[in-house]
Structures are given as C-alpha cells and as structure tokens.
Amino acid sequence: MVAAQDDGAQRKLAHTLLLELMSYQFASPVRWIETQDVVLGQYRAERIIEIGPAATLTNMIKQTVQSKFLHSDRASLLQRQLLASEKQGKDIYYEDDGVGIGTGAEAPAPSAKTQAQASGGAGTIAGAGSSTAPVTAPPAPAAAKAVPAGGMQAIEDRQAQAFEIVRTLLSRILKIALTDVVGTQSIKSLSGGRSTLENEIIGDLASEFGSLPDRAEDLTVNDLSAALQKTFTGQMRKVILKMLHAMFASKMPGQFTVATARTYLHSRWGLGSGRQDSVLLLAIAQQPGSRLKEEAEARSFFDGLVQFYADEHGLTLGANSGAADETSGLGGGLVMDQKTLAALTGGQQELSKALLKIYAKHLDIDLDGDRRALHDLQATVEKDLRLALDQIHQELGEDFTDGVQPVFSARKARRFDSAWSWALQDLLQLYYEVSRTGGETEVDLAAKRCKHIEDAADPRLLDVLQRIVGRFEQQPVLSSMFTQLAQRCRDSLLHGPRYLARPDQQGPRTTISAEGDITYTEQERAEPVPLADLVYLPKSTEAAPLEPFLHLKQRTGGSSAWTYSHDLTEQYRAVLEQATTVGESFAGRSVLITGAGVGSIGAEVLKGLLAGGARVIVTTSRFSSSVVRKYQDLYTQVGSRGSELVVVPFNQASVQDVTALVNYIYDAQGGLHWDLDHILPFAAMPENGRTIEKIDPHSELAHRTMMVNTLRLLGAVKARKEAQGSRTRPTQVILPLSPNHGVFGGDGLYSESKLGLEALFNRWHSEDWSDYLSVCGAVIGWTRGTGLMSGNNLVAEGIEELGCRTFSQQEMAQCLLCLMFNTMCSLCEEAPLYADLSGRMGAVQNLRQKVQELRTEINETANTRRALLEELAMEARCSEGPTPTIDSEPAKATATPTLTAHVRLDFPPTVDYNQEIKPLTADLQGMVDLDRVVVVTGFGEIGPWGNARTRWEMEAYGEFSLEGCVEMAWLMGLIRYENSSSPGWVDAKTNERVHDHEVKHKYEEHILSHTGIRLIEPDRFGANYHPEHKQLLHEVLIQEDFPELEVPEATAQQMKLEHGNKVDIIPDPEGGDQCRVVLKKGAKLMVPKALRLDRMVIGQIPTGWDARKYGIPEDVISQVDPVTLYMLACSIEALLSSGITDPYEIYRYIHVSEAGNCVGSSLGGFNSLQQMYRGRYMEKEVQKDILQETFVNTIGAWMNMLLMSSAGPIRTPVGACATAIESVELGYDTLISGKAKFCFVGGGDDFGEEVLYEFANMKATANTVDEFEQGREASEMSRPAASTRNGFMESHGCGVQILTTARLAIEMGLPVRGVIAFVETSSDKASRSVPAPGRGILSKAREVRSSSPSSSLISSPLLNISNRRKRLDFRKKQIEFARETALEELQLEIAHVEESEVEDYIRERTAQINAEAQKDLRNAQYHLGNAFWQNDPSIAPLRGALAVWGLTIDDLDVASFHGTSTKLNEKNECSLIQAQLSHLGRAKGNVILGVFQKYLTGHPKGAAGAWMLNGALQILDTGIVPGNRNLDNVEAELQKNEQIAFLNRSLDTGRGSMRAVSVTSFGFGQKGAQTIVVHPKYLFATLEEQEYEEYLDKRAKRQKKADSFFYRGLASNRLFELKTAPPWAPQKELETLLDPTPPQTNVDDRVARSIVQQESAEP
C-alpha cells in the first residue's frame, strides 16, 4: 500500500509515524536496568557500541559491570569491550594503527601474578580515558613465546652490555664514528684534553649507570665498561632513553615509533628485547643525517643496523620476508596487516555507499549531476578556447604570437645622468696615465677623453685641472695640454655642450693573402672627402645626370614624385659643415630612439645626442644586465653636462608595449614627464633568405615591427601631445627609409615595410596631426658593420668601384644627426623632408647581381691562391722527401711551453732606497721612536671571494688570474695536489690530471657562479633553511580532543606539566616506558608555519670552502663555531702573510706576555647561538658546552689555545659593523702603551636567517624580489653611492691583521705593509635611534682656530718637521750631556764600593746609565715625533698624525668608505669626509679617490673594516685604486662633496704613488671609527741605509721560507700546525712567566729545534 502511494503521501505517513513513536517513547518507562540485564546477562555481549554525542550509556554500563558482573566475567574469562563513537571511532571501525595482543616485540613468559589473574584473580577496568576498556586483564597469549610472528626460529636473547652504552655515549658526545671509539683509549685521550667534554661524558655516564669508579676518565673504555658491567641491569636508562626518543622524534617517520621499531626487529629478524636494545643503541650512534620520510626507509635503515650488529657479534640471521610488509606501529606479537583490515572494513564501506545511493534515489537527488554539469561546461569552454588558439596559431604562426609578447616594465628603467662624475674620472685617468708614462699615451684615446671632459665639465673640474697644471710646471708639453683643456672646459661652461662631428675618413679594404686568407679592414681613404662635399653634383658624362651622394629632395608641383632640390641640399651642406666646425647643442631636447643596439647606426646617433646634451630614452628588446652595462659604458664615455640616458625594455612588435612606452614618457606620475622633440624609430628585424614564396610569420612580425607599430607609436605620441595641448612644439620623426625597394631580393617584407613608411609624407598633409608631428624621411645608404650589413663588408670596396659610396656608422650617424639641427627641424615643420643618404646606391644597375659577382670573384681568387699554395707544398714534399712528423724531435723541441701558475704569498715589493727613501731621510731619519710605531706586517681574509689575494684580483682587475683560479679551485675543493711519481693537480671528483694552464678554462665558470654576492645556497646554513621558507610558530587552541599519541613516559609527564588538565595520560598496560597521551580540547599547540622572505641574496664564502684545507683537525671543527674556524683560517693566512710559519718563533724575540689578541665580533658564535636557543627549544641534539661557543671572546681564546699560547693582553671589541676598526684601535693602544709588541686584530661574523629577517624588518637590506623585478642580477644588488641604491647586502666571513711595533718588524725581517698613523673611535650625539648614521668622527679634525683675520696663515710651528728636528737635536745634546755627567760621577760612586766589586759595579752602572739615556732618547723621539700633536688643541688629530711622517691633509690620497649601499649612510659619510677635508684646508681641486668595497663583498658586519683595511694596504702596495663597478649612476646629491671622486673603474696611479689612505667604519650603537695607514717607505726613511739593507736581507730569507712552507701546505692541506703544548718545557712554566729576560733562553728546546729545521728547509 505504501509503495503504491506517491512521494507526498509517503512523507506525510513518515511524519505521522515519527510523532507516534516519539510519543510512545516519552510516555513509556525507560526500563534501562532490565535492558542491561538482558544485554550483559542473557546475551553475554562482549562488544557494546554507543552511538551518540557523548559516552553517557557507556559509563553507565561500566558501573553495572563493576557491581554485578565483575566476578562472573572473571570466572568465565569473559572480556568485554565498551566503545563510544564520540571517542573510539577508530577502534569501532578497526582503523587504528594496528590490532595486536602481546607485550612488545618479544613477550616474556607470564609472571606468577599474571598467571594468577588468568586463573581468576582480581583484575581492573581501565579508566574512562582509555581508548579501549578491557574489563579484565587478558591472559598471556600463547604466541608470545620465543617464536616470532611468521614462524621464524628465534635467536637466543642477550642483554645489551655496558660497553655498548659507553661506546654510544662517547660516539654521540665526541661526534665520532663508533669505530673510532677505541677500547684501549681513555675518556681523557679520546676527548683530546677538553675538560668540558670530559665533564659532560662523566656526568652522562653517572646519570646512566649510577656510581662510577674513581678516576673514570683515566680508565680505558674496556676497563671502565668491565667495571660498570658488574652492576649493570641491562636496561637503558635516563640519558640513553632521552637520546633514543630524540632520535625517533627528529629522524624517523611520524608513525615509526620505538615500539614500531621493536615490533619490526622482532617480527622480521627474530630479535629479543635485549638484542633490540643493542640495535637501538647502534641507531643512536649511527642515526641518519636528516629525517627519513617513508617507513620503508626506516625499515631499510634498521636492516642495515641489524646486519652490522650480526657481523659484529658473529650471528647468522635470516629475515622473515613477510614481516616487512606488515603494518608497523604495533605493540604486540599478533599483527593485523592492511589487507586483513581492508577485508574487515571493506564490507562496511560498500554498505555505506549502497545506502547513500538508495537515499539519493529515494530523494530524487542526482549525486553526479553537479560533477557532470561542471565537467561538460569545462569541456565546452576548453574546446572553444583551444579552437580559438589553434586558429590563431595556424593563421599567425608561433613566431608571430611569441614575438608580440610585451616586455616593457617601467620598474626596469635605468637612468644615467651623472656625467659630471665620469668627466672627473676620465680626467684623473688621463692624468695618472701621462704621469706614469711621461706623456706617452694613445693620441686618439686621449683626444676622445678630452672632448668628453670638455663637454661634461663642471666648475669643480676646473679646480682639478688647475692643480694638475701646477703639478706639470716642469713639463711644458703636458702643462700646455692640460692648460688648453682647461680653457676649452671654461668655454663649454659658458656655451654649453655641443655635438661636434669628427668622423674617421676611412674606407673599406678587402685583401686576399698569398695563402688565400680573406681579410676585411677599414683604412684611411687615399683622397679623403668631407661629408659636406658629398652633396655637390658630380660631373656626369652620361645622358642622365647623376645625383649627389647626399642630397635632399622635394616634390614638384602636384606630383607625388621626389626630385633633387638644390636649395634644400645647400642648406643641408651648411649644417654638415656646421657639425664639424661649431657643432650643435641638443641641450634641453628629449629624444626617443628605438633600435639602437650597440654597433648599430642608432647607437652612434645616441652618442652624438648625448654629447650634445640631449635627454634620450632608448629601448632594447634584449634587456639584461650585460646589455644595460653597454649603454652605461656608452654614457660614461660620451655623456655631457645636462644629458640623460634612460634605457627601457621594449618590444616594438607589441601594441601593449607601444602604449606603455608612450605613457611612461609623458606621464608625470611614475613616468618621465617629457615632451618628445625627436623620434627615431630605428627598430628593425632581419629577414634574410625569404623570397616571395617564403613569406612566413617572421616576415609578418618584422613588418609589424618596422611599419605597423611605427605608425601606432607615432599615433600614440600625437594623442598625448594633443591631450596636453602641445601644438606649438611638433615632434620631429626621422623615418628610416631604404633604397632597397626589392633590389636585393630575398629579404621578406623589408622593402614593403620601408615603402609603407613613405605614405606618411602624404598623410602629413591629408590628416590632422601636422601640428604635433613633423616628418623627415632618411634613405639610409650602405652602412658598413651594422647588424644588417656586416655580412656584405667584403664586397663594399667593389661596390664603391661601381660608383656607390659606402659609409661608416659614424658617417651615417653624422648625416642623420644633421637632420636634427635646428635649421632642418624648421624646414620639417613647413613640409616633410626627403633626405637621400643612399650614396647613389640606386644608380648601380642590377645591384644584387653585381654583389653576387663580387662575392664570387673574391671566393674564386682565394680558392685559387689556396690551391696554388697546396700545389707548391706538394712539389716541395716530392723534391725534398717527407716532412718531419709531429712526433719527431725537432717538433718537440719547438713546442710552445704551457703556462704554469705561480701561486705564492703576496709579499710587498721592496722599496728602492735611493729613488724612494733617500729623498725622505733628511726630514724623517731618527725622528720617531720605533718601539711606539705600529705597523701591519700581514693580513688574512675569508670572504665571498676567497682570501685577500683572490678578492683583490676581482676588486682591482675584475677577473681572476691563472694563479687566482688555481688558488680558488683548491680553496673550493675542486682540485687537490697529488704527490705521486708525477706530482701535480688532479680533479677532486674524477682524479684526472689537471695542468695549471687548464684550471682557468675548466673551473672559472663554476668558481664565478659560486663566489661573491649570489642567491643564498641553503646547504651552507643548515639542512632545513631556505630563505623562501622561513619557519615560524603559530599558537592555536585545539577545538576537539586529539587522537592518542604514543610518547615516552617522561615526555608525557612534561606535557602534563605544561598543559595540566588538558592532557590525559594512559599508561602502558604492560608496564613499558611508552604511554599514550590525549591532548584535550583547549590545549595550546605551536604549529609551524612558513614565511616567504624577500631577502634571498647575500655575499657568501665560496661553495666548498672547508677548514680541513688548512689542516684544522676534525675534533676542533666539530667543537667550535664556524666563526671561530674562519678566524683560525684567517690567522693562519695572516701569519704566513707576515712570513711566520711557526707562531712560536716570535717568542725568540719577545716575551710570551708581549703577544696580544684584540680580535672581536658583533655577534660572536652565531651558529652556536642558534643551536643554544632554537636547537634547545626544539629539543634537537646540541653539544653540552655550546654556551662557551656563543661568547664573543671565545673566538680569541681558541686562537690563543690552538696557535699562540701567549700570556699577553686579550681585549675583545664588540662594535657591530665597526668592530674591526675598533679592534685596530685596541691593538694600537696596546702596542703604544708597551703592553705588547705583537697583536692580532680584526673581526668576523657569520650569517643567519634571524639576522637576515630582522635587518629586513628594519628596512636596512635590499629587497631581492624588488631588485629582480627591476632587472638587476644578484651581483648588482649592492650599489654604494648609486642613485638607485636601496639597502645593503648581508655577507659573512672574517678579516685579521697582525700589528707589531716597527722595531720588532725590522728586527725579525717581517714585511711592513703599512704604518698605522692614526686610529680612533667616536660616539655620537643624543638620539633615540641606535642605527642612525653618526657624525662623531668629525671631531678627528678638531682644532682651535686663531681669531686673527689671517688665521689661515697661522699654524703650530710643531707641524713643521724641520722645527721638530731642531728641537730633537737640542734634546739629544741634553741627554748626551746628562749621560756623560752620570759617567763622570761614576768615579765618585765607586768610592763607597768594595774593591772586589768595583769592576762589576762599573759595568752594571754603565749599562744602567746607557739604558737610561736610550730611554730618554726614545721618549724625546716619541714626544717630538710620534705624539707631538697629542693634547694640543691647535693641532687636529688627523693633521698631527699625518705630520709625524712629513705629510699634510693634501697627501691623503684615498678614502675607503664604509659605503653600505643604504640611502642615509653614503650621504652622511661623504659629507663627513668632505667636512673633514675642507676644515683641515685641503686644496681645492685635490680630490680624494673614493673606494666603496662593499659593492663586491657585501656587508659582513664585524669583518667589514678588516676587509677595507686589507684593501687599503693593497692600494698602498700596488698603486691601483679599485672602482665601484656597480656604480652605474652617482646620486646627484653627492655632487656637492667636491673633494671626493666617485670611481666605477680602477685607476692605476703607479706603484709607490699612494702616500696615505683613510678607512672609515660605522656600527650600530653610535660606533664611528677612522684609521689612516701610511706607505711603509716613510717608516724606512727613519732608518740608516745600512739598517735598511740588513732588514731587506732578513726579509728575503723570510719570504723564501714562507713561500716554501706555503707551497707544501697547499700540496698537503696542512697550513695549520695544531699546538698541543706551550712554547716552554713543563718544568719551566713558572720561570718563563715570571722572568722578563730575553725569552729565547726559556723557549722549549723542542720548539727551537722545530724552528731551526724550518729555517733550514729547502723550498
């Protein structure tokens, strides 16, 4: 009946039935007690499931079971399972990780208590929090015997031994392999005497085993293990369990727990719990490097450990192949695999699906309807789109559709307008070149530079020229040259820059040698004819008169034909002459050029416009850093005062780009806001080889580019001019026409494109845009060397013989530029002009045929000569016999020698005494106290470009030499030296021999890709670090109870401590150390999330750099922070750079208390800080003594412990980015005060994502994403002083210098690289900004000014070194008089001495008197030499420090700037240096050369000043002043700093020409620092000639020894000698430290022998 009813009746009936049933339910008694009796008693139900929102009924049933059925259930062994769907869904659906019965991998025999319970003893019911609630304890399963699942024969179990635990602990703590834990060694010997490690090991052993034997650290591992075994229970305890669980938590897949591993070891390998412990101990010691992702990987990992264990213990194990496929994560011996579980649950899933379909059918719901509708819609849309795209591709072709893609981006625009800076740079380069060569320089190049200097000159350039003229007073020729240049600059300042044409009068020349080689050259024409003369009509003997090579045409009457116009041509001739005489100014004009690729006619036009002062926007379709750099170089060479060049990416085939380009030019907001005066649409595309039947999509694309979109471009300009009402300033359009109207053929639609442009001549009259655009068509002739015509260069000479004139690019550019002169522009505004610049190409009949004939003739002539030569050679062979083969002796004798790399330490060259030193001795000899003069004898560096030597090659020369490539390849682990029967370099991977000359070719590309400033290479900074995936933690409150987690009991208690009642702990019913935890609703979780950082580029040390290369041992590498490793390597470099191969050598000259260390850092051991905070927080494995590695002073401590073993002063500067120069100040003060005579200084820092992130938050660093969007490469992103700079680039590494007293350096023969003349730090004014740029170092120029009107004429007489010398001479006489007086009084003194002691008394007293006299003399030298200026308010510290060496502020040649590439730093720093120089009276025009090193290295914080100081010393050494190659355009605001020259290329000033260099450094926290280093020749001038010669002899021997040691170190990777004992014998420690007498008497004999052996070693 129901079935027969319709749907409405059925719903009504169902509603009525529901109401009746609910009424019955509410009206009837519950009868819950009776229901339970029936279910539990009558039916004896074992599995009861409650479906509902809470476990209400389940809890009631539990109480009933406890009160009524507990004893009967035990008696009958009945087990009940009570489940609630709200909590135990997985158990209900059998979806848990597994179902098992048993105790673990191998269940032990049931205990007596368990057996009693199984016989009916009392059991317990699990609490309400249990996932399953067994009512009674189950009996021990029969399967839990000694037979594993799978039926495999069990292995006899054996407890883990104490030795295994001891070995595991030692392996993990010492970070060594298990095989390196030798049983016969003690803990003390294994830890290398590191007490911290010893204490950690002993503490962990005590925690694990309880009491330990006395002096456990001195027992061998075997003896210690045997002693511990006596009381060892065989159970893993606190320390090992913590390591075990940490290993599983960090290295195993999420579901692979300790219990899972035990189950697997039991089921697959039959291992009992004891042997499982042994394998787990192996896992702790040999854990994988990173987390295993799949359980299969984990099982494979444990398989390997089992095999290792079996081999170690001589076991033969057979694996149960089926066990590996079973589900993991089970706690018992019975295992239910996935197939069985699927079989159990599969029926339920099928039933659910069937019910769903029935309900859907009943409700008339189509379950697949929406999916089908969406699929049909998607298919329809996709089909239509695909059809449309296919039609477009078929119609237009792939070349066309790809070729019209837009590329324009206003963000990528590059602007160049700092011509003033490049003019000064050209002037300085010209000056130093003529100074070095005595005036012998390339004439043409000098003339071009002079023209550029003239065009771009500003008033300060005149001051520089005036000073240069003064320096060449004794050289009349050079003085005259610069005087004339100065006059032309003055004229240019009066009249403005002008374009002046000086094209080369050269013609084409094709020659064919006797060997048949074809050569094309440009040679001076035999009869040069100026371009202006090419407009004259030639004499014609033909019936039809010939037109001039260059002429203008006009229309006659109403005809559309163009004919020669004498009047217009005469006007054109006048401007051609004007171009070579007075020129033309383009100042104030705005020009657009498309198609001005380097080497094109457009590029030459661009040069002329820039030389004339125009603003030009040029487009390029191949926008890249290399292309932009070519335009930058072009502007640098020719840009004049007021000119500007803008380069943008642009595809003229794209309509979108045409619109965007014009908008960018005219828009005031975000654009240039220009109104164009000229447009040169020169963009073209070659179409070679395309005849009429081969017109293809490329031809259409070219036609669109050269004609269609040219018209669109002009239309867009017209629209913008009309919109802004610009009717009185029409834009001149130079249309690039062609005489090739199909004459050549085979060039696609090229001629049609050019002919199409000629229609504009008529449209100018017929349309409404003549007020906005004027038109000048230029028929461009045969131009040699362009992209379109370079292939025809060989026939150009022959073409000229046919009566056609060919042009160079410069000549054609002049012709076109003259069309833009004011005269021609005025003519264009009246009517379109037609300029025929074809050189009468159209007059040559059958041009294509003629060209082919010429080409054929050339090739035939060449082939004939080659054949003739070959025939002659054959005749010679036949008449003279066989020629020698390549293997014959003569051939070998004449083989070209291969290049050999001479990698060596860069000792500075010796200074010639007569030429460079002697002229200074008159003032300086004997004028300073050498014990209080501080010199730099050596330096080291680890940075993005390797060491200091390789960094200098890139900084000074822009490329690596062969030696630089060899050293970098060694440093990066690409090659190694093999000492075999045939020693030499071999490839580190293939072991193939690599000759020296092959290294650069083979490895340079790889080296350049993995050095310098580049995208972050995550592998260097931790396995889980990537800048695009910075991990952060997000706190959440969970909304429902989590599924159970299996964790160690200790972890569970810790979670309980943190979360309180939000955590339920379910103990393991078998009493194991694992338990289950339920995180309840409301618990707090920290969920990892990732942040995409936009700082992805930094300066990084070379990929592959490894401290092992220096011989630093593995135990040190594993112990110390990377910054310490950098500092150790730097210290080794610095020592070798000083010629010191064994640091203990210095103790033959000074006491151990006189060697100091002042190295510092801004952050210290940053990697260790990360581990200490993040690693500990995340419970990663971290060494126990990590705290000590975080201290800044630990770096210097390791240097002393492993290298120096000194007892001298140790001071640790922390000055942020100014740390290194602050370190120099500390070292300087330490030496000047006499506390030390030898000192390490410098700084170092590492990189970390935390610092990167925080600098980004401060907006201090450049945004990498923005930089890439602007078209910058990684290497360009640090641009100090550039107008587009936008933040610094982080970097890392370290730098070290060795400072000594001058006397020690001379005594030891150490190389003197520079004198520290001055170094001080300064704080700043009141502020609230820690990183604000400081002004404090201005105080280094402080001095009292006289109130006299002529105060500039008054200065302290002490500044005159002659005055000081007179005073010193007088003081010397006083000292000598005092000494003589004391010696005379000695006779009175001995009257009171016993006769037997008189001789000794006289000798000792005489020595004392002489020593006092020497001390007085040194004090006099110091106070009248080194420190005469100190505490004198009338002498500025900078002025006084220079005056010590006879120098003035005008002798400060170079300033090395901190230059971080931030907006504020350069403005502040440059203004500071400018203020210092001006205040101290530096002469006008005497510019200081600015160096901005961080463009190359990035900003390494603590190491910054050290790298800059190293560079400053290299400048003094070589005379090369490096340019800032990333300085594409100097910020306009920096132009006001008239005393500073900003360079973007290196200047070679000549070796020995640099006198003093300033280095400034600034750090967060008000740290400002400045130091001045002076050339060592000024120090040598204080010595007698004999002293200097003796010093050179010592230095030469030292250099020879150091080079030999360095060669051997490179070959053996042993540049570092680990010091294991101090330089004195153990029994002499007290004597050595307390006795200040000559230290060599206390140096250990073994050390002395080592030094002697090194000195006698052959190189």
UniProtKB/Swiss-Prot annotation:
InterPro entries, per database record: Acyl_Trfase/lysoPLipase, Fas_alpha_ACP, FAS_alpha_su_C, FAS_alpha_yeast, FASI_helical, Fungal_FAS, Ketoacyl_synth_AS, Ketoacyl_synth_C
* Region annotation (Disordered) ranges: 114-139, 1631-1659
Q: Carrier domain location, by residue?
A: 160-235
Q: Where is this region: Ketoreductase (KR) domain?
A: 588-826
PTM characteristics: 4'-phosphopantetheine is transferred from CoA to a specific serine of the acyl carrier domain by the C-terminal PPT domain. This modification is essential for activity because fatty acids are bound in thioester linkage to the sulfhydryl of the prosthetic group.
Recorded GO MF terms: 3-oxoacyl-[acyl-carrier-protein] reductase (NADPH) activity; 3-oxoacyl-[acyl-carrier-protein] synthase activity; fatty acid synthase activity; fatty-acyl-CoA synthase activity; holo-[acyl-carrier-protein] synthase activity
Q: In which pathway does it act?
A: Secondary metabolite biosynthesis
Q: Describe the outcome of a gene knockout.
A: Eliminates more than 99.5% of aspercryptin production.
Using the record's annotations, give every residue carrying the modification O-(pantetheine 4'-phosphoryl)serine: S195
Give its E.C. classification number. Answer: 2.3.1.86, 1.1.1.100, 2.3.1.41
Pfam families referenced in this protein's UniProt entry, alphabetically? Fas_alpha_ACP, FAS_I_H, ketoacyl-synt, Ketoacyl-synt_C
Active-site residues (renumbered): C1217 (for beta-ketoacyl synthase activity), H1458 (for beta-ketoacyl synthase activity), H1499 (for beta-ketoacyl synthase activity)
Q: Name one GO biological process term.
A: long-chain fatty acid biosynthetic process
The induction annotation reads: Expression is positively regulated by the aspercryptin cluser-specific transcription factor atnN.
The Ketosynthase family 3 (KS3) domain covers which part of the protein? 1030-1575
**Quaternary structure per UniProt?**
[Alpha(6)beta(6)] hexamers of two multifunctional subunits (alpha and beta).
Q: What does this protein do?
A: Fatty acid synthase subunit alpha; part of the gene cluster that mediates the biosynthesis of aspercryptins, linear lipopeptides built from six amino acids including 2 highly unusual and nonproteogenic amino acids, 2-amino-octanoic acid (2aoa) and 2-amino-dodecanol (2adol). The core structure of aspercryptins is as follows: Ser/Ala-Thr-Ile/Val-2aoa-Asn-2adol. The first step of aspercryptin biosynthesis is the generation of the fatty acid precursors, octanoic and dodecanoic acids, by the FAS subunits atnF and atnM.
The family assignment reads: Belongs to the thiolase-like superfamily. Fungal fatty acid synthetase subunit alpha family.
Q: What is the protein name for this chain?
A: Fatty acid synthase subunit alpha
Gene that this sequence comes from: atnF
